């Protein structure tokens, strides 16, 4: 579990299968004294999917986010399958001094595969210049794994900024 002791799973809709799959979290070897698996639900059901976003779910659970006593958050989706040591990912982020670190995978078959994924445009220092859909027009691409790490304080401020800019 990459030494991660506190896991929050945000669920927008149809939670039964997620809850059944995760169970109590005991099989993830989470330290029962200092860690926990927390399932967080969206407080409102929006009939319009355009407003049923990760941001709205984070906003509905802002109190839990604000109470976290951890300096960093790792945000990862449920629909990407990959193997990574998140502890190493976090340490690499801290050592880099970057505000946000994105996880990506260099591929050489982006013309035929990963067509539903976003790809990153990187500069020479591997800084992100763009995030855009993979249109299948290049063989070599950096596929964004929809996973990032940043300070908790920055994450909360970005959520609040998104709320102010949005029509939610």
PLM regions and their residue ranges:
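Rossmann-like NAD(P)H-binding beta-loop-alpha module
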Residues: 56-60, 65, 69-70, 105-130, ...
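Conserved N-terminal catalytic core of the sugar/cofactor nucleotidyltransferase
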Residues: 1-72, 88
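Conserved beta-strand termini and adjacent loop/short-helix elements that scaffold enzyme active sites
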Residues: 40-42, 103, 131
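His/Asp/Glu-rich metal-coordinating catalytic cores
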Residues: 67, 84-87, 137-144
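Conserved donor-nucleotide/metal-binding helix-loop-beta segment in metal-dependent transferases, i.e.
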Residues: 83-116, 122
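Acidic metal-phosphate-binding loop of nucleotide-sugar-dependent transferases
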Residues: 79-81
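Catalytic-core segments of class I nucleotidyltransferases/pyrophosphorylases
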Residues: 123-168
């Amino acid at each position: 579990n990459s030494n991660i002791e506190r896991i929050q799973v945000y669920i927008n809709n149809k939670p039964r299968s997620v809850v059944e799959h995760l169970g109590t979290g005991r099989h993830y070897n989470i330290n029962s004294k200092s860690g926990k698996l927390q399932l967080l639900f969206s407080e409102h059901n929006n009939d319009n999917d355009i407003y049923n976003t990760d941001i709205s779910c984070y906003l509905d659970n802002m109190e839990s986010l604000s109470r976290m006593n951890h300096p960093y958050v790792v945000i990862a989706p449920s629909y990407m399958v990959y193997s990574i040591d998140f502890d190493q990912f976090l340490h690499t982020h801290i050592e880099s001094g970057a505000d946000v670190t994105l996880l990506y995978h260099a591929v050489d078959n982006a013309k035929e595969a990963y067509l539903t994924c976003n790809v990153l445009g990187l500069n020479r220092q591997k800084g992100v210049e763009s995030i855009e859909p993979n249109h299948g027009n290049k063989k070599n691409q950096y596929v964004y794994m929809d996973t990032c790490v940043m300070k908790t304080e920055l994450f909360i401020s970005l959520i609040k900024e998104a709320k102010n800019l949005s029509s939610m």
